[in-house]
Design a protein with these regions (language model features):
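Charged, glycine-rich intrinsically disordered N-terminal tails and low-complexity linkers that flank
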Residues: 1-71, 203-204, 209-240, 245-250
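Phenylalanine-focused residue identity feature
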Residues: 10, 27, 44, 60, ...
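A residue-identity detector for tryptophan
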Residues: 41, 79, 107, 129, ...
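Generic structural marker for isolated residues within well-ordered, non-membrane alpha-helices
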Residues: 46, 77, 142
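Acidic-basic catalytic patches of nuclease active cores, encompassing PD-(D/E)XK
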Residues: 66-88
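Nucleic-acid nuclease catalytic cores
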Residues: 84-105, 109-194
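Conserved catalytic or regulatory cores that recognize and/or transform ribose-phosphate-containing ligands
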Residues: 156-234, 249-250
Length: 250
């Protein structure tokens, strides 16, 4: 069941509660728009593991379009509310009940919808306007928002203060969401295993085994490319979250 967290986006509390959790805005690092495993899968998993161990958010470059999106979000949401004759509501973020995945839509729309706002550069806005279609690079994020929130649709608003504005509705894609669910299950298993949350990977749970890794990520959910290494698996340090000794920290 989806759980809404009513905190201000980008606040200190927002970052703390989201720490180390796969987020829909980064689902493209887990799954491609075509439903295949992303080549960024392992790198993203290691990033989240590092965040959990360090207990701080790891900052990255934010493009001008991303910065602009934050600045114009309120104005764009007001325009959408008037243009579509709907009521929108701010939201911090939404997680599943196990707190293993999350999404941060820009607004809730009524009881069934979401709003995601993009503020692209002018030439990109024109490209979206001419194509009249959702750019595939947004597909994992939008489908991920529907997967986590269990809402019926999400409106993608590509907003510019002068150029034509575009609103495109996206509904759940059953085949893609099935593939997304599969990849998220594997991804979260790796996270728990390598962070010492799965009892099979705790110290004393048996000797490490040698496994084959396809493309640098586990071939199956039970294959952890960190703890399966006999040298790495023998190293351990206290878990900063529980105070217990766990295998797999290095």
């Amino acid at each position: 069941m989806p759980i809404s967290h009513d905190v201000r986006q980008y606040s200190e509390e927002y970052d703390r509660l989201k720490l180390g959790i796969p987020t829909s805005s980064n689902f493209h690092k887990i799954i491609t728009p075509h439903g295949k495993r992303s080549r960024q899968w392992r790198e993203y998993a290691c990033l989240l593991i590092a965040e959990r161990i360090l207990q701080r958010k790891i900052e990255f470059y934010r493009s001008p379009a991303m910065e602009r999106g934050v600045i114009v979000e309120a104005e764009a949401a007001d325009w959408y509310e008037f243009d579509q004759d709907v009521t929108v509501q701010p939201i911090g973020f939404i997680t599943d009940d196990a707190h293993t995945v999350e999404c941060s839509p820009d607004r809730l729309v009524g009881d069934d919808g979401l709003l995601e706002i993009k503020a692209p550069l002018p030439h990109t806005q024109v490209d979206y306007w001419l194509s009249g279609a959702v750019n595939e690079r947004f597909w994992p994020q939008l489908q991920g928002q529907l997967y986590v929130s269990q809402r019926r649709w999400v409106d993608l608003l590509c907003w510019h203060d002068v150029l034509p504005k575009i609103v495109m509705r996206v509904e759940p894609d059953a085949a893609f969401i099935k593939a997304l669910d599969r990849e998220l299950q594997s991804f979260n298993f790796l996270y728990r295993a390598c962070h010492g949350k799965d009892p099979r990977y705790q110290r004393g749970a048996g000797p490490p085994r040698t496994i084959g890794i396809e493309g640098g990520v586990p071939s199956e959910p039970g294959d952890c490319p960190v703890t399966a290494n006999p040298i790495i698996a023998r190293r351990h340090s206290p878990d900063p979250l529980s105070g217990e000794d766990r295998a797999g920290h290095f």
